[in-house]
């Protein structure tokens, strides 16, 4: 295990090391950035301007400029994830706010359970305790349940002219809709809720006709298919697909508190699990992403998992978490998928960011650039900014650079949420609240 730390003798944490700033925009908060050619595509966290997606010309990285903005046509949804392949862009459509939507789905069962227990209708205080929410949020949950939600899915866009994107279709799925996903020129690998399942599963769609995505196959964690008679061995949606990434004839599926799975899709109509590993609850934060290192290291096949630092919901919870392991990067030997072995970890010390204990801000890992060359990983670390990590020794990953954006728009701390690279080696960062940065690793 390695830990990034400047040490007390070096004083306050420096904001950058071997990474230099090139360009910046005070862009609305975002969930994902993807780069294709001379354009960056940004999927937004819910915002007052109702932005769904922004397209940015990055031909001159020192002077990026917005060429198109797509606003949401549905106030009950958000569209914070985006991918591009060729002239096709896909964005997610997911219930907003997600947490309220999930509690709305649970409300009828909670009411029935409490009514049977007490012989009367439950109070808001009882419902709040049962649903794990604040009492003043129960009314919002009740209203959301009364409205229902039928807009979940994904939208396909023609971006052959990036300054003039054209919607092709809104393909609806089920439940609260689609979260993160992967795609290429032929298929979309969608993480979505579907009728009859608990939590997100993988649904693969053929994009031969972008106006009519056609389902090819499904994959899920055993126990999710409740309509098929399966029974989950966990509470709620704790074991579910976060998203799955395609590498060759495999899908690498991050399964939240269920760890990760490796799926053989040589026959894409029949996905087949060939390996799985769950390192929770030893590590308390859920698995956000899993990917294989593109080359063997020391003759072994290596995979990298990155966990997502969960959001503390109160000052008391923030205090209670002190001393708990933050979300981190983990390495695994996956040479034999049937016998996966943990190898190493990489952590960032709270000493390495002046914003690590900013009230209300997250500090810990979230996401990495999901396509890597060589052994360098670029990871988003919330108030720890960007961390550049070399995994050449998977037993002891080491930090080789970092960049912590200065907070903007009056925010007390950066919340670096997502990172992508272009074919020039430039690095693109988005912040959950405000900020789009272009930086370069100089190491």
Model-derived features: positions:
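The alpha-helix within a helix-turn-helix
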Residues: 128
